[in-house]
Each structure stands twice: as C-alpha cells, then as structure tokens.
C-alpha cells in the first residue's frame, strides 16, 4: 500500500501533487481541467501533471491551459479490427510501464482518471502500485476504461445517478465539473443581430454541419438579424465557411475555438450535441439550446442527457434522424422570435446546473488520500 509522504500535503492537508489522466475529447478533458483549477484554488502551490496521449485533444489544450503534460502510448479497443487491437494492446502495456516510471518520478498524492482510453495506463499503474485513485464518469453508461478499472478505485465520481450500479459502494454522485469561466457568464440581453453558436463537440459533427448549411436558404429573410459562430471540427471548416459566404451570412467559422466560454457568453442560442460536458456547460452558462443527440453514443446516453433538459423545460431536442435544414431553421426562427421563451429556457437551464461538482470531487480525492495514510 502506498503511504503518503508529508510533502504531498499542504499546510491545511490539501493535495499538493496530483496526476489527472485521460482525455481524447473535450468531454473528458474539460472536467479534468475544472478539477485541476479547484485543487489549485485550495493549494496555490499545488503541482498538477496531466497524462494523456499525443493523439488526443489534451496534447494541444493542456499546455495552453498552463499545465504540464506527459504523453503515454495507448490505444482504443473499441471500434477497431483485430490487428489494430493487437497493436493498441502492445501500446497500452508500454503505456503502463511508462506510467509506473512517472509515478516514481512525480510521486503524486492521488491519481484522478477523467475517462477515455488515455486514462487506462496511468490508472492501471496506480492500481498496481497502490496509489490513491478515483475516476470521473460523465455519462449514464460508463466508458470501457472506467468499466474495466472501476472495481479497483477508491471512488467513482458520477454525473448521472443511473451509473451507480456499475460501481457499487465506491460510487458518489457529484455532478460534472465545469470550468470556472462558464459559471460567471452573465444573463444575455437579446436583440438583433442574434448570435447562434453551433458546434458538435471538440471534434465537430457532420450531421449538424450539414443541417446548418441546408438551413441557410430557409433563414434568408433573417440574414441581417443573425450572426453565426460555428466550430466545425478539422475536416469541414472550408466547406462550411464557403456555405455561409455563398449565402451571404455573417459567420465566424473555425475548426476549433480557444476560450470557448467567450462564445457562450455572446450566444443568444446554441445548437449542439448533447454530451454530458456540453450539457453541463449549457446549464452553468444559462443558455438556451437546440440539442441534437449523437445517435451512436453508448446506450443512446446523449438522448437521455437531452431528454432530461427537455423535461426541465431547459432546451429543445431534435433527434438526429429528424434533423433537416428546414426544421432547424424553423426552430431557430421560433426561439429567436420569442424572447420570453428564450429567457425561460435560459432560467431553467441555470436552475438545473450543479455548480460545485469539482469541489465535491476534490473532497473525494482528499478522502481517498486519507484512506491510504
């Protein structure tokens, strides 16, 4: 069993060194950044080390956020052929060996897994060497890495109570952490030109991009009353930018936006997928949204996320199979043409927000460390 050394604790028994492992997409990474900020808030001299892969979004964003990053080999076991699985298995074993070296060098108080296959090597090494560890699970159905390792962690911090059965008495419902900037976004005064923020997560969404492109002819009479801010993902940025230009719309189109909270703050309406982190950010920001759940998410959990928002009268949902340019345009016109309805969605979204999730998770991390002393 790992025995905590005095130098991993702050003067008030706060965590001085922590590893945050995983990423791949913003949905995994951004909650981890929120937790890192909370650790720093409690201990201003705390050292945070992120561990991920070179292929994930963390390779670009973690250094931009001012944190150290170490990359390990790892690979997904889902959605790939047997040859790729064999290669990824070898990479993951190498990653576990590398993770053990990192643990020996950094000697953290705790290892926090944020999900994704990138978390697997570091969490596995923490389990094998007895370091305190916990996992964060954002979705109603856990990812493969969390399902495989969940029985050997100290705690599983959950967003959705329905996930409880996967982790038994290690499960604690904390909510999904949101970066601090989203919580301080003020209410918006709605007046033309209305800003519509469109994105499909950190990697974009082809069906949303297509529907927005096809919606433009149906929004032609609103051309002077709309401004689009559209995060397309890497593969469609030029195509979508050209569509706006050809239709004569004012649009800022990029593959990826840094400082995304600024786009939320300026938005009158959001069109997005319904990943757990996106939904948590929409709630925290208090913004009205049209949610288009990704239809191939495990056990259709994005539909469950969106439906919970609809049940709270906090968002509009359009099923991916029913998403057309004409329907999207009609929904945009309906909401932006009724400011009272827009403001009601915003109020209800903010009411549904859990704003202290990262505090609850760091409390769990401290509890995990204390259990190993």
What are these regions (language model features)?
Residues 6, 11-16, 181-198, 205, ...:
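Nucleotide-sugar donor-binding and catalytic loop/hinge architecture
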Residues 18-23, 45-91, 96, 234-236, ...:
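Conserved nucleotide-sugar phosphate-binding/catalytic loop shared by glycosyltransferases and other
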Residues 49, 57, 68, 127-187:
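Active-site-proximal region of nucleotide-activated glycan assembly enzymes
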Residues 56, 61, 65, 187-270, ...:
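Donor-nucleotide binding loops and adjacent catalytic segments primarily
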Residues 98-111, 119-134, 147-151:
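Glycosyltransferases and closely related glycan-assembly transferases
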Residues 341-355:
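A short, well-ordered alpha-helix in the C-terminal region of glycosyltransferases
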Residues 354-373:
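C-terminal alpha-helical cap of glycosyltransferases
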């Amino acid at each position: 069993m790992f025995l905590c050394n005095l130098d991993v604790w702050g003067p008030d028994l706060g965590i001085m060194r922590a590893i945050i492992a995983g990423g791949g997409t913003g949905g995994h990474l951004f909650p981890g950044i929120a937790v890192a900020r909370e650790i720093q808030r409690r201990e201003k001299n705390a050292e945070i080390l992120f561990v991920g892969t070179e292929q994930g979004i963390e390779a670009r964003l973690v250094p931009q956020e001012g944190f150290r990053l170490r990359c390990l080999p790892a690979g997904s076991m889902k959605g790939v052929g047997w040859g790729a699985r064999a290669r990824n298995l070898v990479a993951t074993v190498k990653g576990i060996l590398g993770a053990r070296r990192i643990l020996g060098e950094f000697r953290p108080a705790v290892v926090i897994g944020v999900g994704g296959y990138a978390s697997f090597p570091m969490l596995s090494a923490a389990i094998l060497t007895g370091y305190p560890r916990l996992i964060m699970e954002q979705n109603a159905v856990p990812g493969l890495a969390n399902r495989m390792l969940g029985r050997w962690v100290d705690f599983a911090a959950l967003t959705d109570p329905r996930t409880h059965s996967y982790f038994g008495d290690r499960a604690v419902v904390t909510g999904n952490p949101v970066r601090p900037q989203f919580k301080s976004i003020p209410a918006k005064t709605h007046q033309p030109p209305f800003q519509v923020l469109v994105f499909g997560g950190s990697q974009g969404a082809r069906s949303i991009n297509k529907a927005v492109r096809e919606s433009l002819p149906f929004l032609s009479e609103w051309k002077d009353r709309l401004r689009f801010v559209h995060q397309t993902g890497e593969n469609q940025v030029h195509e979508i930018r050209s569509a706006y230009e050809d239709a004569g719309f004012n649009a800022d189109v990029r593959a990826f936006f840094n400082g995304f909270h600024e786009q939320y703050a300026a938005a009158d309406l959001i069109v997005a997928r319904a990943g757990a982190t996106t939904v948590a950010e929409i709630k925290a920001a208090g913004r009205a949204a049209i949610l288009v759940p990704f239809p191939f998410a495990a056990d259709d959990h994005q539909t469950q996320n969106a439906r919970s928002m609809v049940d709270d009268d906090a968002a509009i949902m359009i099923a991916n199979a029913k998403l057309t340019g004409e329907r999207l345009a009609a929904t945009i016109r309906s909401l932006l043409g009724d400011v009272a309805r827009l403001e009601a969605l915003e109020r209800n979204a903010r009411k549904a927000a859990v704003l202290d999730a990262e505090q609850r998770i760091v409390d769990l991390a401290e509890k995990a460390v204390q259990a190993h002393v």
